[in-house]
């Protein structure tokens, strides 16, 4: 028994000699549809992501940040306003930054959980510090004041591994 809404619609390509494709209608996906071409003018690039870190920190303390605009685009397509987003490879904290920006933009209440192993103190020195500054506001190296995204909070939990003889 198929109980996940209306049956999906399919069509044949190349007059029946190609493949089968699924037809997606906007009303069935909440008016949002993903495309397979995302130009960097809309989603950013790594150079932009590094410049964003420089605006926040004065330098780029992380080698491979993701563009905030890219993650905002992903979340806009894949979440609703009350989703919980989980990132097990938190890196520089772009996921939380993008979540807070999108919430401010569309009035959402998305929650974001970041997890990292704190290799080279990245969580303490980059991930946490970045998002603390984004929430509280900061001054760029050029002296510009950036207003904080004050309607957010940030909690930091430290965990540890149990030795094998103590685990269940």
Regions found by a protein language model. Give the residues of each.
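Class I S-adenosyl-L-methionine
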Residues: 1-84
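Charged, often flexible domain-edge or linker segments that flank or initiate folded functional domains
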Residues: 1-2, 6-11, 110-111, 115-118, ...
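Intrinsically disordered, low-complexity boundary segments flanking structured domains
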Residues: 19-28, 101-102, 136-147
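Conserved beta-strand scaffold positions in the cores of enzyme catalytic domains, especially
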Residues: 37, 112-114, 156
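Residues at the C-termini of beta-strands that transition into short coil/loop
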Residues: 41-42, 116, 160
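Short conserved micro-motifs at the rims of enzyme active sites and ligand-binding pockets
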Residues: 48-51, 125, 165-168
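Conserved S-adenosyl-L-methionine
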Residues: 71-139
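SAM-dependent methyltransferase catalytic region
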Residues: 129-168
């Amino acid at each position: 028994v198929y109980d996940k809404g209306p049956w999906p619609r399919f069509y044949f390509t190349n007059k029946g000699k190609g493949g089968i494709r699924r037809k997606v209608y906007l009303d069935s996906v909440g008016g949002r549809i993903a495309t397979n071409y995302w130009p960097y003018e809309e989603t950013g690039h790594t150079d932009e992501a590094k410049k964003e870190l420089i605006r926040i920190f004065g330098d780029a303390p992380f080698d491979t940040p993701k563009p905030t605009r890219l993650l905002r685009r992903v979340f806009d397509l894949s979440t609703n306003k009350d989703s919980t987003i989980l990132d097990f490879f938190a890196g520089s904290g772009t996921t939380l930054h993008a979540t807070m920006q999108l919430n401010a933009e569309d009035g959402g209440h998305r929650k974001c959980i970041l997890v990292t192993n704190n290799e080279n103190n990245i969580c303490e020195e980059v991930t946490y510090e970045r998002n603390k500054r984004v929430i509280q506001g900061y001054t760029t190296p050029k002296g510009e004041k950036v207003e904080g995204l004050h309607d957010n909070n940030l909690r930091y939990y430290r965990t540890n591994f149990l030795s094998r003889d103590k685990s269940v």
